Amino acid sequence: MSNNSNKRAPTTATQRLKQDYLRIKKDPVPYICAEPLPSNILEWHYVVRGPEMTPYEGGYYHGKLIFPREFPFKPPSIYMITPNGRFKCNTRLCLSITDFHPDTWNPAWSVSTILTGLLSFMVEKGPTLGSIETSDFTKKQLAAQSLVFNLKDKVFCELFPEVVEEIKQKQKAQDELSNRPQNLPLPDVVPDGELHRGQHGIQLLNGHAPAAGPNLAGLPQANRHHGLLGGALANLFVIVGFAAFAYTVKYVLRSIAQE
């Protein structure tokens, strides 16, 4: 018997999986897309986009479903291929919707139901056979690394060209952001005629420092001299004013005495 005949699924499984495929295309599962192998409808591959507000945000997680020839009367096995920090890679996962628990399997469950259950368990932290424990930091690192990892997978690229393009666009945006020159500090600009201090305590006029030269170093000393001169003049004006007032009073008193 040839390999192709070994891979040929029974009519019941084929019909059911075709129906499930049409259902997924019409009503996609949130965050997940799935495609069967063109050569074997019993092997499906899926991609989970990491949901927002989770450690998996920004990541792309590739895995596969292996359906038995008795599907839908027996459950499939589920594998995760992309390193993710939640499940072991290329290991059968023990979930209530997999072949680890045929006693809890419901033939009415579709491929959409299976993938929804997988995503639900992925964002939880409950342990199971095939799961691992890692920190959120590690999961975020793996999410960032998943882009490059998946682009190296031939099956991934063949089955999910739209996702591949999405990843490449995201990588391009990240590269442009990282290569963008840092913004230079803006000059200190103030209204015309106003002085304020810029960096290193240098006074700026209209947002510009005075031209470099011998006078620049003497600015603080010159300002100090101007302050002393102004204070002396103010004291002199007070003394002169007081003397004038005293002379006026004396003159008035003398005039009254003569009368």
Swiss-Prot record:
GO-annotated biological processes: ERAD pathway; protein K6-linked ubiquitination; response to unfolded protein; ubiquitin-dependent protein catabolic process
Q: According to its record, how does it sit in the membrane? A: Single-pass type IV membrane protein
Q: Which GO terms describe its cellular component?
A: endoplasmic reticulum; endoplasmic reticulum membrane; ubiquitin ligase complex
UniProt topological domain (Lumenal) ranges:
248-259
Where does the UBC core domain lie?
12-162
Cytoplasmic topological domain residue ranges: 1-226
Q: Which reaction does it catalyse?
A: S-ubiquitinyl-[E1 ubiquitin-activating enzyme]-L-cysteine + [E2 ubiquitin-conjugating enzyme]-L-cysteine = [E1 ubiquitin-activating enzyme]-L-cysteine + S-ubiquitinyl-[E2 ubiquitin-conjugating enzyme]-L-cysteine
Enzyme nomenclature, EC number:
2.3.2.23
Under which pathway is this protein filed?
Protein modification; protein ubiquitination
Give a single Pfam family match: UQ_con
By what name is this protein known? Ubiquitin-conjugating enzyme E2 J2
